[in-house]
């Protein structure tokens, strides 16, 4: 099978790290294609960044339809554009935050998230609430480091994750830790050994969910909510999004 992993930001070095994590998790017969959109922010650390990343994500989903892709993974812990992406393809589309919290719910009664800057705490609280996990997620723990800081200074990054992970276990009574950024994938295994609880990387979780859905032969329902968008004109910078719209399959 062919899985397209979309890093919604435009930092190619981060995409390479995501690609490595995805390929490490995937089966030997699964082809991983990791990409960044041609347009979007260098990192996603605010609502503004998130919303401006979505057109690039949708563009990559549409390209995937022509590339023979069997499933898509949106590799950002905000799951930007997830629902819109499901409208423009019948292939499975999974987000790494969604995959992480559902996997964690099968491994632990309660768990905490460790992520980047404090400003995104409310964003992620709202996100896990939308997945029905507000009673399972004990805390969204943040660090002073931005998304790209983990790429620039991995030693400082893992130390921050180690500190907040320990606090999550000792103070929150978390029984699992979720790494709340796609750029944290390389730290999961060592943190799990140190903390003594499951540590879940969303890229790995997303790839395994995508493989499973394809294996089961399931596709996105097109009955109502995720049916193809109605054809209409889009103008200005969005002009191309109105061309060749699919309404049936």
Swiss-Prot record:
Ranked from the top, the taxonomy reads: Bacteria, Pseudomonadati, Pseudomonadota
Pfam families per the UniProt record, alphabetical:
Asp_Glu_race
Q: Enumerate the catalysed reactions.
A: a D-5-monosubstituted hydantoin = a L-5-monosubstituted hydantoin; D-5-[2-(methylsulfanyl)ethyl]hydantoin = L-5-[2-(methysulfanyl)ethyl]hydantoin; D-5-benzylhydantoin = L-5-benzylhydantoin; D-5-isopropylhydantoin = L-5-isopropylhydantoin
What is the role of the protein in this entry?
Involved in the asymmetric conversion of racemic 5-substituted hydantoins to the corresponding L-amino acids. Catalyzes the racemization via enolization of D- and L-5-monosubstituted hydantoins. Is able to racemize 5-substituted hydantoins having aromatic or aliphatic substituents such as 5-(2-methylthioethyl)hydantoin, 5-isopropylhydantoin, 5-isobutylhydantoin and 5-benzylhydantoin.
Coiled-coil boundaries: none
PANTHER family per the record? PROTEIN DCG1 (PTHR28047:SF5)
What does the record give as EC number?
A: 5.1.99.5
Q: This chain belongs to which protein, by name?
A: Hydantoin racemase
pH effects: Optimum pH is 9.5.
On subunit structure and binding partners, the annotation says: Homohexamer.
Q: How is its activity regulated?
A: Strongly inhibited by Cu(2+) and Zn(2+). Slightly stimulated by the addition of Mn(2+) or Co(2+), but also by metal-chelating agents such as EDTA or EGTA, indicating that the enzyme is not a metalloenzyme.
Q: Which Gene3D superfamilies match?
A: 3.40.50.12500
- What keywords appear on the UniProt entry? Amino-acid biosynthesis, Isomerase, Plasmid
Q: Which family does it belong to?
A: Belongs to the HyuE racemase family.
Temperature note: Optimum temperature is 45 degrees Celsius.
What's the encoding gene here?
hyuE
In the UniProt record, does the keyword Isomerase occur? yes
């Amino acid at each position: 099978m062919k899985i397209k992993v979309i890093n919604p930001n435009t930092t190619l070095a981060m995409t390479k790290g995501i690609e490595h994590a995805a390929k490490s998790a995937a089966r030997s017969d699964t082809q991983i294609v990791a990409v960044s959109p041609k347009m979007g922010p260098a990192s996603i650390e605010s609502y503004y960044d998130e919303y401006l990343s979505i057109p690039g994500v949708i563009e990559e989903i549409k390209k995937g339809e022509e590339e023979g892709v069997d499933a898509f993974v949106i590799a950002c812990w905000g799951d930007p554009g997830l629902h819109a992406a499901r409208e423009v393809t019948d292939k499975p589309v999974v987000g790494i935050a969604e995959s992480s919290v559902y996997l964690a719910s099968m491994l632990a009664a309660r768990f905490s998230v460790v992520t980047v800057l404090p400003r995104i705490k409310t964003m992620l609280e709202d996100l896990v609430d939308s997945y029905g996990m507000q009673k399972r997620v004990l805390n969204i723990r943040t660090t002073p480091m931005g998304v790209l800081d983990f790429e620039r200074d991995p030693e400082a990054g893992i130390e921050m994750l180690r500190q907040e992970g320990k606090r999550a276990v000792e103070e929150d009574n978390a029984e699992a830790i979720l790494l709340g950024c796609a750029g944290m994938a390389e730290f999961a295994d060592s943190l799990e050994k140190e903390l003594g609880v499951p540590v879940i990387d969303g890229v790995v979780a997303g790839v395994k969910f995508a493989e499973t859905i394809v294996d089961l032969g399931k596709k996105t329902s097109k009955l109502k909510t995720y049916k193809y968008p109605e054809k209409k004109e889009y103008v200005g910078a969005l002009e191309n999004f109105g061309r060749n719209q699919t309404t049936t399959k």
